[in-house]
């Protein structure tokens, strides 16, 4: 085809026809690519199987939940293909979850440099590797600075609340909104970042608790220098530029600074754009989640499936099954979660079984900050979850006092900028709600009081107007602007 080919100027191809052609491409690749375990060289059969499994899970669940397509009767076919492609890879016993002796394997996986084999990593199926000479990138700088030269990143409370406690139960184990029964392991929001304690071990390998990781990192020698630097508490800022100076670049919009992907290598930050942090494109951990979800959607999942998928991921993360046996997920011991169930009941137009709820939770937690959440919500027809209020940490009196320290005083030279926080009113840098939780982006005209807008038209991207001008046979997706109006 070339730009004048008539095939490019006809009406839209039906979704079913397009998808069948995509499947033919996958099957051709699987049949013709080499069957080896080279994760960063030529594309191989395992990579094609992985992509087929991921694609078929997307298409199967999209067809199941998007009833407007009238394709629900074909959803199972795609879920079965997703399941089977994943199982083919699993049966080769070629890939295994990355583990280490220090208990931080989940964090360590995402700060590797060089080929996965050199790092003792058998989890990565496809990686993008950089040498820093001919090929590099600037992500180490963005993660190291927490994107402080643009709008800063930050973890919201609604995200934190989805992480279980270390006993395998959520933070609220009974009751209803306004009268929840609290898990005894959950320390609540009234302390100094203590809500991160006693939780799924991946939480503190994703979000930095002051006193750990970036908050005590000495950029001069790439060591954790608590004695020299003290704890560098996160600066809370919304504005571009983030202020100056910003020692250790420890800024955030919510009070919770991300630590996943952050690597303690200042030289690599400054090597921009020649950073060498490995990019894991396909990994075995995601494949296990795909398999578990496909099996659950088909109504086939067993305790054995849970052990080789969800429970394997939890064990790698650091869950102590000997201390908390119920942290091991089984079909007969699925924890209650009144908070999440209430959100699903309010935001979704279908019910979610307890086991699917837990698998979706596991997927969100395990793949946090890997760019999958948006597409997951699209295929689950769960866009209204975007309207769950986004809030930052609770500004307790202790934190308000901490953030009011005068940085001109040598005693507090490494503390955050002075911040005054009249509860419920505009402070010097922080605005909080009636309960004292930070409202991110308080001047935004689209995110109002932490609530993001949603419109169902966003389940489908708009067709660019210039494409419709070139091809009048194309029709705009529902809800988006057409060339005729």
Model-based region annotation:
Residues 1, 15-34, 40-65, 75-90, ...:
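Extended, hydrophobic/aromatic-rich amphipathic alpha-helical segments that build helical scaffolds
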Residues 3-14, 263-273:
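Acidic/His metal-coordination segments adjacent to aromatic residues that form catalytic metal sites
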Residues 9, 38, 189, 270-275, ...:
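Hydrophobic alpha-helical segments with strong N-terminal bias
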Residues 19, 46, 56-240, 385-415:
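An aromatic- and glycine-enriched ligand-binding surface/loop that stacks and positions planar moieties
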Residues 21, 91, 106-170, 174, ...:
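Long, intrinsically disordered, low-complexity segments
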Residues 35-41, 95-102, 322-324, 370-372:
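Surface-exposed patches in mature extracellular/periplasmic domains of secreted proteins
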Residues 193-316, 467-485:
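C-terminal substrate/ligand-recognition segments
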């Amino acid at each position: 085809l070339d730009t004048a080919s008539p095939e490019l100027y006809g009406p839209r191809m039906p979704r079913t026809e397009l998808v069948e052609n995509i499947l033919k491409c996958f099957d051709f690749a699987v049949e013709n690519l080499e069957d080896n375990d080279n994760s960063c060289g030529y594309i191989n059969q395992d990579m094609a199987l992985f992509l087929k499994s991921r694609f078929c899970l997307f298409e199967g669940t999209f067809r199941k939940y998007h009833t407007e397509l009238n394709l629900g009767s074909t959803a199972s076919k795609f879920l079965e293909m997703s399941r089977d492609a994943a199982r083919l890879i699993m049966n080769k016993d070629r890939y295994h979850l990355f583990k280490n002796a220090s208990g931080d394997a989940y964090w360590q996986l995402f700060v590797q440099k060089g080929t996965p084999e050199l790092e003792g990593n058998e989890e990565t199926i496809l990686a993008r590797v950089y040498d820093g000479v001919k090929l590099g990138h600037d992500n180490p700088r963005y993660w190291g600075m927490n994107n402080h030269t643009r709008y800063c990143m930050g973890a919201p409370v609604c995200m934190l609340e989805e992480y279980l406690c270390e006993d395998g139960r959520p933070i609220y184990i009974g009751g209803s909104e306004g009268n929840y029964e609290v898990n005894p392991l959950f320390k609540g929001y009234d302390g100094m970042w203590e809500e991160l304690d006693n939780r799924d071990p991946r939480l503190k390998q994703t979000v930095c608790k002051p006193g750990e990781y970036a908050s005590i990192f000495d950029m001069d020698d790439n060591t954790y220098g608590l004695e020299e630097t003290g704890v560098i508490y996160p600066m809370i800022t919304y504005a571009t530029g983030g202020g100056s100076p910003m020692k250790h670049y420890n800024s955030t919009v919510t009070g919770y600074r991300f630590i996943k992907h952050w690597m303690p290598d200042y030289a690599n930050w400054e090597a921009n754009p020649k950073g060498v942090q490995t990019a894991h494109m396909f990994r075995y951990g995601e494949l296990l989640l795909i398999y578990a979800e496909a099996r659950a959607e088909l109504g086939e999942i067993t305790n054995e499936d849970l052990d080789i998928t969800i429970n394997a991921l939890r064990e790698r993360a650091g869950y102590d099954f000997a201390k908390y046996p119920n942290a091991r997920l089984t079909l007969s011991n699925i924890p209650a979660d009144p908070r999440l169930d209430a959100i699903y009941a309010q935001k979704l137009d279908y019910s979610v079984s307890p086991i699917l709820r837990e698998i979706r939770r596991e997927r969100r937690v395990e793949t946090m900050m890997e760019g999958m959440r948006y597409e997951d919500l699209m295929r689950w027809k769960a866009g209204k979850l975007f309207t769950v209020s986004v809030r930052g940490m609770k500004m307790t009196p202790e934190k308000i006092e901490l953030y009011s320290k005068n940085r001109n005083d040598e005693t507090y030279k490494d503390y955050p900028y002075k911040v005054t926080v009249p509860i419920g009113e505009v402070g010097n840098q922080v605005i909080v709600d009636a309960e004292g939780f930070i409202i991110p982006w308080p001047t935004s005209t689209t995110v109002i009081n932490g609530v993001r807008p949603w419109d169902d038209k966003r389940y489908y991207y708009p067709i660019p107007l210039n494409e419709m001008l070139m091809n009048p046979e194309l029709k705009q997706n529902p809800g988006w602007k057409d060339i005729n109006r």
